[in-house]
Amino acid sequence: QYIFSPDKKFRTWRRLWIALAETEKELGLPITQEQIDELKAHKDEINFDVAKEREKLVRHDVMSHVYAYGVQCPTAKGIIHLGATSCYVGDNTDIIIMTEALKLVRKKLISVLDELAKFADKYKAQPTLAFTHFQPAQPTTVGKRATLWTMELKQDLDDLDYVLGSLRLLGSKGTAGTQASFLELFDGDHAKCRKVDQMIAEKMGFDGCYPVSGQ
């Protein structure tokens, strides 16, 4: 349940803001280590009350939480969400949460497969009646029947691994997916813009980002 909780969601937003600030600092923007440290010091202290009151005024969830984080981090407030758009925290967080949830399902699925394998081996010689077209057919064993369940779940595991292996972060591509805001921040340096996505992905534990997006 915690994986899908508001606390998990907004803590992940803050982790993404820290990753963005670190990346921008490493690529030469005037961001100080003091600002990074301040962000890290408050990353798990979500001030929901401040964000809620701010959202009543601005009607924007992301900007409300940028403001709330800035209240806790006055030195760093000017560099929170720098160059990014709402999808940077929204979509990336969805992908991170989906990945963590699927990994949890995978862990539980492997446990079920392990127990089924033991069950099938234990009852491999236990006779039972098999059916076809809902009619009694021929003898089989309980263990043999269990291997059918195991095979289907193994196929589910293969599908799950394929999905997990194909998931990437959105990255940070700006308002229209062109990274125009970053191109401006980096004074037209395309090489630095290209590095932004990969560096953020690595900081968040992903191999890379999707190459194109609308935002």
Predicted regions located by residue number:
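A helix-coil-helix interface module used to build multimeric assemblies
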Residues: Q1-A180, F186-K203
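Amphipathic, heptad-repeat alpha-helical segments used for oligomerization and assembly
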Residues: F206-Q215
